[in-house]
Amino acid sequence: MLNISTNMMINQTLNFDSNQESQKNKTERISKTKLTRELITKTDHDIYVDDISFLQREDNVNVSQIDLTARGVLNPEDQGVLHKSTEFGVFNKNKTGLPASVDLKIKQNSFFSVKQPDFNKYLISDFVEIQRNSFFTLLEKGIIEEFSKRNPITNSKKTMEIFFYPDYYQLTPPEYSPSQAIIKSKSYTSKLYIPVQLTDKSKNIIKLKWVYIGDIPLMTKRGHFILNGCARVIVNQMVRSPGIYYQKKIYENFSNKWSEKPENTFTRYFADLICNRGTWLRIEMDKYNKIWAQMKRVPKIPIMWFLIAVGLTDKIVLKTVMDSKILLYNLDEDPLNPRKKPLPYVKTPPAAWSAIYNIVFAKKIKAQEKAKKMLELTEGNPSSKSQTKNKTSASKKSKTLNVANTKGKTPAENIKTLSELIDLEKALFLKSEQGRKWIFNKFMNPRTYDLGKVGRVNFNRKLKLSISQDITTLTPQDLLAATNNLILVSKGLRELDDIDHLKNRRVRTSGELIQIQIGVGLVRLEKTIREKMTYASGLSSLPSQKFAFRSSKQRNQSPVGDAENATQLTIGNLINTKPFNGALREFFGTSPLSQFMDQINPLAELTHKRRLSSMGPGGVTRDSATLAIRGIHPSHYGRICPVETPEGKNTGLVNSLTAYARVNAAGYIETPFYRVYKGQVQKKTGLYFFSAKQEEKIKLGAPDLYTSEIGFLPKASIPVRIVEDFTKISRNEIQYVGVAPIQMISIATSLIPFFEHDDANRALMGSNMQRQAVPILKPQRPIVGTGLEARAVSDSGHVITAKSSGIVMYTSSKEIIIYSLQ
């Protein structure tokens, strides 16, 4: 007892001495620094604290060595500090003003030592980061990319040229702030100005001018847009990633509708070539092993014709493709239909172009043949005034106005019919050039077909090619390798693709959706500019036969303006803001992905901005969506919440991002993991984010595995997941472990206390009904919470936030008073 009491007295003496020294250091530091009082009130714009390097309070402790990078979310009820860290997450407040959830130990030197494992439980990024980052990418790269694709715009004779310089574009400050736009029912937009150069080669004139293109809606700091006084959110869209995917479909034939077992079955293998913009192409092998190229609203084309039409020769095709006899099956005679003529064998691209044109435009050719017969009948009918033995050409007879004067019709009534028949007669001569243009515009024109860099990477990886990422159209090598792989898939030498796997699906964020719509507006703008330049150069003169019978008002009206304005062509006359503004107005006003923001409570707003929709343009519909699309896939772990989804027709089609998930630059969803090195969880090295494709190559442990004080896993065998299989391995074989148990669920679901004991159906209802709760007048802390409540409110932007670090002296719902060290 004597030894114990002596030791206690010694420790108290040491603590007293150290406290005296720390107090002296504190007074010296305060005397050298100047305390300034800063008042922060609630303004129109949301204010965020960039960082709080340290917090100093009037206690006998020194916390200068603790780095708490925070955004200063403050509790209106107390005058202490509630920390929300962009790096370490949300903490509760204790009496000392320091995070209570952090295990802090006071040493004899009065310094705090932070226990690292508890800190790393809260490494959650900003919840609205997906919206802000996508819009930043639009301003940084998207606008420049879309204008660069339209350069240059020329007339038909190439004598006039419009060239944009998007790298130097400027945005003006918005006319209204977000709050003013809401009050006055205006839009929170900025005007876009771009330098434009007009070159007239015929007159050797070059003009350069800043031009107003249109209005760009701006995103607020809370991640939404304000149009006509209404807050709108652009929902993120989940679509199939551009690339090539091999699948099969099994067909069953039943003898009658009452039979239980199918009479026979057959399998069709096909490859879907998906692009960002343009026509989707399917290469399909039918039950007779015939391979066809298929497109929407176009008859199927033999694959041999298609490969030769894109520039390959028959020798290259037959030598490269495995079991090349399959390519010739659809050129053989059909034993089931012997009357049908076999398709011809082509060797050169011009022959293939003509053959494809005959198939694609078969209906048009039949109509032209009927017109030709009508012409022959018309030419054989003599005129009423004079009979001729020798037939003359229709163009020569049209001058006499006596050609088609049959059954009492006057010559003037038949002029219009005759001119149409003459036009059809000219179109009867099919040229291979027309087929070549059709193939080029469908798959090889960068203005009409675009794989994107993501699609090019997927093509190269799947087909083992090394084509440059700058080439975003289909190449002959792509189609040849795709056909060869389809044959290998049908023989079981290649694996099929799982289209529901997240490695084959990507997210179109709000910035990308706006960029696509900007491209639509620029296509319309390009069309109007080209029409104006063509008219100004005198190339829009109409044929005399069509122009002769127009009314005097129509003849006097000019499609662009009068002749004087056409001769004095300027950049301002060429560029109009209507196409650009109209395209954006259509998207924000009528698109199903642009929705009125849910503002019932902060959680509803936050969830709305993190929503993922599989519907919309280029997506699926409620009626066509199958259970496979709506279901939960193993790759959703840590990326898409398996609980939070609507009830009804939209079940599984509308989802939410998980709490830790983020979207990378390519549009794939990533989730974080800790690295494990020789059985030790390396939390200090930071987080490793993996997409669904990268996750297939690693061995993952559960996030709730027991670890020692220094981070070592148990020596016993540990359950892990490898791709979709579960097994047990030693701790030295584990590569990564999860970050936290809430990694697999969304923010709304993570607010449910004791979620693991809840029924799945009730948890789904609870996640959705939390968004319908009406906020109370006097907010209070939850009696039972999960620790993410303050973080959800702070990221939604509904609370006052401090803009600098310091000592909090007073907080309320209207103002924050801080003493800061400067």
Curated annotation (Swiss-Prot):
Localization per record: Plastid, Chloroplast
A molecular function (GO) term: DNA binding
GO terms, biological process: DNA-templated transcription
InterPro entries given in the database record: DNA-dir_RNA_pol_su2, RNA_pol_bsu_protrusion, RNA_pol_Rpb2_2, RNA_pol_Rpb2_3
GO annotations of cellular component type: chloroplast; DNA-directed RNA polymerase complex; mitochondrion
UniProt entry tagged with the keyword Plastid: yes
Name listed for the protein in its UniProt record: DNA-directed RNA polymerase subunit beta N-terminal section
Species whose genome carries this gene: Chlamydomonas reinhardtii (Chlamydomonas smithii)
